[in-house]
């Protein structure tokens, strides 16, 4: 029998280039931060994980890592227990300990699954219950964006996207390159009527494409209610139009268009009030902050029981995260919508062989045991050096936006 007790846990912060994408919080910084987690067993098997790379996450992982030595990689309850002890011991330094707990567990748990899969010759999708779909469909994630970051001399390859016409160009490029079928617009940047004009331009250009829009809570309930006649029948779901469960319940009560969320139902404690108030009918899961792959499968089961739709949230990520997302989605029977991914926006990669390739907008589950991906150590070293050089330790889209628009002010809701 393989010795699957944990011998070492290594956490390496990295930074990779990110375009100047716009959202309600501001503008993406030139570098996105991630952490690469390696869980090594006593037999020398190394499992991989990828998660957030901001200072609070890195500090917590640094405390948790040595406490995991001797724990078997199958002992997920032990992981939760030891992570909770860290949260309790360090609680005076955490403003939202429960949210950090699920992020700490989510970071390490994936690497434990990968290590166990590699040790036993089984794919993670099989360990999660078995593959239920041959391919996993993803959506084109459309953003308004500046031509280049503040201080850069020339535009990036995407160029400026601030009009409906340029949104159509952006969507066409993603469809041509990756074959995506569904289109998602990140909104909450401009006046709602302007963003809905962008949706109409997309509908005209791509009449068969399912559309969705995500204002990130930027609209008031009153604004959202006024906009519903334009959105009903146009979008497959409306994601986080306004703030909170109660505010969105007001909206859902008067529309057949399902509301979706990745902002206001992000913990198991949010599910009962959401279900009771019928606020969101689609949940966007994310193993990075729900507590890992098992917790995300548990969430999927709850959604199935209560008749909630299920999709998958994304943030700026690289290939280890994308592989984990693909395994999870392939093992989730009730995945009812195409998943989100930021992958087309990233040019760097940390796995051998380069970026995973979309075919007709979908990914196949990587072959091989565990997650089926291998860490590219030269890329890891280069991206770690980026982290050391870039000077960014937290995500601050608002500060980045003010470099472009000094008078810009954050608001949620804003319109």
Q: What are these model-predicted stretches?
A:
Residues 59, 230, 243-260, 265-374:
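Shared catalytic-loop signature of beta/alpha-barrel
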Residues 6, 44, 108, 121, ...:
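Conserved, mostly hydrophobic/aromatic
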Residues 47, 136-140, 181-185, 211-215, ...:
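Hydrophobic faces of well-ordered beta-strands that scaffold small-molecule active sites
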Residues 40-120, 406-415:
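Metal- or metallocofactor-binding catalytic centers and their adjacent structured scaffolds
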Residues 129, 134-252:
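Metal-dependent enolase-superfamily TIM-barrel catalytic cores that perform enediolate-based chemistry
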Residues 1-48, 52, 342-350, 398, ...:
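Structured beta-strand/loop patches that form or line metal/cofactor-binding pockets in enzymes
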Residues 371-415:
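Extended hydrophobic packing segments that form well-structured cores
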């Amino acid at each position: 029998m393989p010795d699957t007790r944990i011998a070492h846990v290594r956490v390496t912060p990295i930074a990779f280039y990110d375009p100047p994408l716009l959202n309600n919080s501001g503008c993406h910084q030139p570098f996105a931060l991630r952490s690469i987690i390696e869980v090594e067993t006593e037999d020398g098997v190394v499992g991989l994980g990828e998660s957030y790379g901001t200072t609070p996450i890195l500090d917590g992982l640094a405390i948790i890592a040595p406490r995991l030595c001797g724990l078997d990689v199958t002992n997920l309850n032990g992981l939760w227990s030891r992570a909770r002890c860290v949260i309790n011991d360090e609680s005076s330094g955490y403003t939202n300990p429960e949210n950090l707990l699920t992020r700490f567990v989510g970071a390490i748990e994936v690497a434990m699954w990968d290590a166990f899969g590699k040790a036993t010759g089984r794919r993670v999708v099989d360990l999660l219950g078995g593959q239920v779909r041959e391919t996993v469909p993803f959506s084109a994630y459309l953003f308004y964006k500046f031509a280049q970051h503040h201080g850069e001399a020339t535009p990036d390859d995407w160029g400026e996207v601030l009009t409906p016409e340029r949104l159509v160009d952006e969507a066409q490029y993603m469809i041509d390159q990756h074959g995506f079928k569904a289109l998602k617009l990140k909104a909450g940047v401009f006046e709602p009527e302007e963003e809905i004009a962008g949706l109409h331009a997309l509908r005209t250009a791509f009449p068969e494409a399912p559309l969705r829009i995500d204002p990130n809570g930027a609209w008031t309930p009153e604004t959202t209610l006024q906009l519903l006649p334009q959105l009903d029948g146009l979008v497959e779901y409306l994601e986080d139009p306004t703030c909170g469960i109660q505010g969105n319940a007001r909206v859902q009560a008067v529309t057949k268009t399902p509301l979706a969320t990745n902002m206001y139902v992000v913990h198991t404690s949010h599910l009962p009030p959401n279900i009771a108030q019928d606020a969101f009918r689609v949940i966007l899961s994310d193993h990075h902050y729900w507590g890992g792959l098992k917790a995300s499968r548990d969430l999927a089961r709850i959604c199935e029981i209560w008749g909630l739709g299920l999709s998958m949230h994304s943030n700026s990520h690289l290939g280890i995260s994308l592989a984990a997302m693909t395994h999870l989605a392939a093992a989730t029977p009730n995945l009812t919508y195409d998943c989100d991914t930021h992958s087309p926006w990233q040019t760097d990669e940390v796995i051998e062989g380069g970026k995973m390739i979309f075919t007709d907008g979908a990914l196949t589950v990587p072959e091989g045991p565990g997650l089926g991906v291998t860490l590219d150590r030269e890329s890891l070293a280069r991206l770690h050096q980026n982290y050391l050089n870039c000077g960014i330790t937290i995500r601050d889209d608002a500060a980045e936006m003010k470099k472009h628009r000094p008078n810009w002010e954050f608001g949620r809701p804003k319109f």
